[in-house]
């Protein structure tokens, strides 16, 4: 209900200016405008208008101004005033809508937005007041037939917007039938806007009646696949608009559908066509195509000589007459109900009854079927006379006649009901002919399959059951099988217990009952989940007592398979027929014939897949109904049954949606056990299971509720322990209904809810929980209000008020200080006191106006507790927010240096000196971080310089004890924590390029873990450029390792997984945000990926890896910003031609995808950077390599240049002119294409910018070789120097590259001599003796100081990086005139780059070096 309903009606006529009439009739347009502005102001200030006042004259004058006034300003104001009248009067305005629509449509020819936009708004509001679009059908069709394209376009858009408000159950069939062919014609209009508008209108129609009906109405136009695809897209948009409108206007409790007139009379804000917005949200089937067909009078088109031929003695002539009639009926499925078909039906049934030829009789049956289908309920008067004849003819066994008779009896009875023909059916069941009995039983089976316990005619059923029971003992096997099928279908329709009561005579016959239950199960399988849900719901409605509470009705179970039927029989045994008491169903025999009620195997109960993400995505896109209700609706339950039925086993589904709460308990026990046996299946379906739990919250059985809360606790604890993220949709679908249970009277139930809320607080954090807690304060239940306030107080006390400041907690809680309930009052006061502790007097301002009594209560509590303003201390930071969590690990985590190998055995240590360690089995390892990179080594390495402890790491430990479910997460000691998160991520990204496979893989797993955390992935996204560069370096190393014959599958899998997740992106309103990657980075990653594909993909073992890399390259095209992407691709092609890497063809193929992306994204391009890349390519290819101008690569690049020019226009030429030495081919191509564009009058699609890419700080990717790692280990860990030296010797002996690197180190590094002596000493004695400990300390200090300061960097050059771009960096117009100035951005580019250290870091270095000198 909107605010309009609470406003008072206002008569605006007395509020108009005294000279209003004079001004509105003035000849000066300024005065007329002044009058209209005054009227508009009054209408704006008074949104609800009096329905007793007469506004006809005023609205008529506005209509005249809109139609005749020559001034566009006056017309626009008149349109706005009419819209305000429509909004203010709503349903009472409908009488004015008819005359106004033609005027509005006629004025739509105006293109100026000043008038067009008010007209659009006016038409929307006027249309909402109409009871149905059919009332304005003629005006709409006339407007669509106008020659002016603007009128046609705006009218079609108006129709589309109005149809977006219509629910399928209230579809204006006549209007749709008339307008769809017109829209179909307009889809071929010469004007593109008219075509798009008509397609949008057809999309709105398709949402209502379905695509099949739209195709039928469009006829030949539906063969255009492109148009139908667009219509489908607009249909999806219409669905979203309808859902949005429905959510906006739906009242708290969805009422049943009402007629448009009733809605309009009640002042519904949406008017006639929008009445669907407040109707029930039950799923609506696709519209019946029959409703949109033209009625056909078959009697006036009867074949020539029909009357004569039908009476002919020759069966061929009778057959020919009936074939002509059948062809006519088949071609026109909908018959005119006004015609009199009595004589024709009588003649056909006579032929069916008397004709001796089965071909003629079969044709007569088909004709009767066609007439019944064409007339539908209008055929009902003939059903009683035709039905006995059909049953009698069932004695014919031949399919030629039998099959048409089956279709005929179904069609005839569909026009009436089973009760009307009950006596006829009963008579047919008593016939001695077995074929008649068989077909009659099968007919009943088909009837029962369409009925439920509500629609089943019970009296008729009771009269039919004895005959069916009798048939179950018939000597003919087909009769017996047919009767079992009928009784199985009956059991499906009315439920098992009522069926067993009706079948008491054969209840003790296990053979018969097993056959019936077999057909019962087949009937359930044929019906499908949706039909079963409706069926069982009707069963429970029929069984429910008259005074049943509404919540009981809104949670119907699903179905009743055989595995629960034994339980039902044991709980409520049926009374056997008299004389059969001793033949009660034996328990043992049941256990042999039927499966006992035992929980299925845990691993089969729920599927383990990734459908959860898709469900959440569809719910965001409104493709699924939002889980938001005051009481569960049929649509919500049906949707949950469908979704859960796709994941759960049938036996579990039957227990979850059973009527008996004992079955719920059995299902809950099975699900709780899954937490131990198959936790991943619970996590994969946690959203659905928690929704099912919310349905149980609306029930009152204490035992079931306790068990449900136990399952909820198990699920949320599993989510917390495995650090599985919970989406906002998942939380909002569960928590509000969980909080309802905080108001329960039983303390144990409230305690369970508190535990669950505490766990959820750890998972999602107070910021997400608090809005739902505040909303729960609206409850009338005092316990619920007090419990929610206690949780809010806990949040504020522990996390402070700052994270919750935006939620206005104080203002929401303040009114509860005056609550009637003492517990609520105390809890509210405590919340405000907690706020005062953090905010001080600002709390009073945030709380707003409070009653003096309430304020004094809070002040008294503050004084009594002695709380000082601003004394609050955050005891624990809010959990669930943007941080990086570490999964719990088994065993201790140990410190190890950045380059230590993982392959070393675990050797606990005991500290003996500052440098040396002695192994001892009794000392446990200690914990610390692992990596120490140069970027931030001063924050950690210098602090540990005084007491260096080198500890050998153990083997990696699994972080999850269960083999069936493992988190894809590294368990190393360097797992990223919430402390120094940014630095840790930076270290991990740098380690991606490590030459040690285990270090690189570990870093990739850590980055992947962060990317999987929605709250933290932005920390990696903004470093995407560095991740790509590090990955490119690692892929180059992978190629070398692969060529050397080593296994690279682990590294490759980790790398591709990380990059795929990185490029999956974050979902935004407009799709995926482009990743920040510079052209050089794009070139590097593209080149590395393609080289891997070529070198690895040619081998059998690398085929799978190459496929992953191929998809990775395609994903990269979709995610990178277009200018950087094109520049990177051109640079990669240039480099490939220069170095002959063999990837040129692949780069060309990838580049073609850039054109497709340009069409999709329509983004601006940076012409300066792009032209620079093209120029470099042409210089390389044409000047340096002297390639032919007709070479395929040259032509491909020419094509891309043409696309850029068509997109950007003259900006490309300006960019080329700024080049100091543009290549001749480049300028020639640009001039040629621009000349062509001028000749053909082609405008640029999206003129771009000349700005070059802003220079960014270069983040170097540190790649430490294996030689460097080994040498660092020797200097860090002198106690294990011998082992490290052995590793170094093995490494330098393995390849010439390692040997050369080692020699280079000895030559250039200050520590080279020391390393050389240590290696030589170890080679001679196999051990190293350190006599002077202070020398060792000095060496270690020097090594750490060198590691801290990093390598010496060369002085940055003072000239720009690219001399060809000098004129774009130095601003002066031209350079010869006046002094040139250097912009700030360009100044940064040419400024020398020097290493800088903070004062603290320099002080630490000086202090350390001084201490070393003193030794």
From Swiss-Prot:
InterPro entries: ARM-like, ARM-type_fold, HEAT_type_2, TOG, XMAP215, XMAP215_CLASP_TOG. This is Zygote defective protein 9. Plays a major role in organizing microtubules and spindle poles during mitosis and meiosis in one-cell stage embryos. Required for default nucleus positioning in oocytes. Residues 255-276 have a biased composition (Low complexity). GO terms for cellular component: centrosome; cytoplasm; kinetochore; meiotic spindle; mitotic spindle astral microtubule; mitotic spindle microtubule; spindle pole. SMART domains: TOG. It is found in: Cytoplasm, Cytoskeleton, Spindle pole; Cytoplasm, Cytoskeleton, Microtubule organizing center, Centrosome; Cytoplasm. The TOG (tumor overexpressed gene) domains are arranged in the N-terminal region with each domain composed of six (for the most part non-canonical) HEAT repeats and forming a oblong paddle-like structure. 3D-structure analysis shows the presence of additional HEAT repeats that are not detected by sequence-based prediction programs. Intra-HEAT loops are positioned along a face of the TOG domain and bind to a single alpha/beta-tubulin heterodimer. The TOG domains seem to be structurally and functionally polarized. SUPFAM superfamilies: ARM repeat (SSF48371). Interacts with tac-1 to form a heterodimer. Residues 562-572 have a biased composition (Acidic residues). Belongs to the TOG/XMAP215 family.
